[in-house]
Amino acid sequence: MKESVGNLRRLVLDVLKPLDPSIVELVQLLAEQNGVDGVNISIYEIDRRVENAKITIEGHDLRYQEIVGVIEENGGSVHSIDEVAAGKVLIEDVETPQD
């Protein structure tokens, strides 16, 4: 059997979410998903009823649709996928002269 090397290892999502559930509740729900090793949620803007959040998820064989399902079931929506990584190892961004 061929080893799976195309699996998703990291997702960075820009998400608009309601104030309820809290990020503490949402991070726990996301962390319970199959293949998830860690989740970080940072709020970068708060409005009267919503929060803009950066959600970083790392693991092995992440299931994008299941992750989006958890976010949507809790009233959120994914605005964009800001980073995605796959393969046997995670490659960090390297600063170049253009940066």
Predicted regions mapped to residue ranges:
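Long, contiguous binding/interaction regions
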Residues: 1-99
